[in-house]
């Protein structure tokens, strides 16, 4: 037979479980966001370039259309970061570029009328799906 508890005990237990759930959520969001950031930087470094096309004095070879952008000066690569904040009972993760010219990362991700997309953020999220699924199972069972 189940042990009877008082309303006060029940509320304390509920509060404890609520705090643990929020801590677990924050851990999941923090680790997932960091992995997406790491993956975005890795896929840019490892992207396939087009040797038949060259731009600029240095002879920068852009990535093949549809692949993440190739690193040229490293501006985008160095600007990618993540942050996690807690608002009420939610842990919110953000991954993106803190570059001052906000059009640059967006133009690479989605393309322009003259340039095909070089997705870096969405490609990172796709690559991290299994990592996040396994992490979810590890944290939440």
Residue ranges: model-predicted function:
Residues 1-141:
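Short, Lys/Arg-rich flexible segments
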């Amino acid at each position: 037979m189940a042990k009877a508890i008082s309303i006060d005990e029940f509320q304390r237990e509920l509060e404890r479980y609520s705090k643990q759930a929020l801590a677990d959520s924050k851990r999941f969001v923090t680790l997932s966001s960091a992995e997406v950031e790491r993956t975005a930087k890795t896929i840019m470094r490892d992207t396939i370039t087009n040797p038949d096309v060259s731009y600029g004095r240095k002879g920068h070879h852009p990535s093949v259309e549809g692949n993440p952008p190739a690193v040229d000066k490293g501006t985008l690569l160095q600007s990618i970061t993540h942050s996690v904040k807690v608002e009420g009972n939610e842990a919110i993760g953000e991954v993106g570029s803190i570059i001052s010219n906000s059009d640059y990362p967006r133009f690479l991700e989605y393309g322009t009328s003259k340039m095909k997309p070089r997705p870096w953020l969405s490609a990172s999220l796709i690559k991290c799906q299994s990592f996040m699924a396994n992490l979810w199972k590890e944290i939440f069972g």
